[in-house]
C-alpha cells in the first residue's frame, strides 16, 4: 500500500469520493482545496484543481 498525492483533473472533477474510491480501489484521506484542508465524506464532490491524499489498495499506474 502506498500513500500519494494526486492532482484532480477533469477525469475526477465532479465525481464523489465514493465513486473515485470504488473505481480506483483507493482510500481518500484528505482533500486540499485552495487554502482549505477538507476531510472527505462519501458524498463530497471533487473539483478540478483539488489535491487528494490517498492510499492505494491495489496496483495503480
Regions found by a protein language model. Give the residues of each.
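Intrinsic-disorder/low-complexity, polar/charged segments enriched in Ser/Thr/Lys/Arg/Asp/Glu/Gln
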Residues: 1-3
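Cytosolic Rossmann-like ligand/nucleotide-binding regulatory domains
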Residues: 5-61
Amino acid at each position: 500500500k502506498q500513500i500519494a498525492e494526486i492532482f484532480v483533473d477533469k477525469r475526477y472533477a465532479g465525481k464523489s469520493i465514493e465513486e473515485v474510491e470504488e473505481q480506483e480501489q483507493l482510500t481518500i484521506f484528505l482533500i486540499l482545496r485552495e487554502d482549505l484542508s477538507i476531510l472527505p465524506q462519501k458524498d463530497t464532490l471533487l473539483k478540478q484543481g483539488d489535491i487528494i491524499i490517498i492510499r492505494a489498495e491495489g496496483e495503480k499506474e
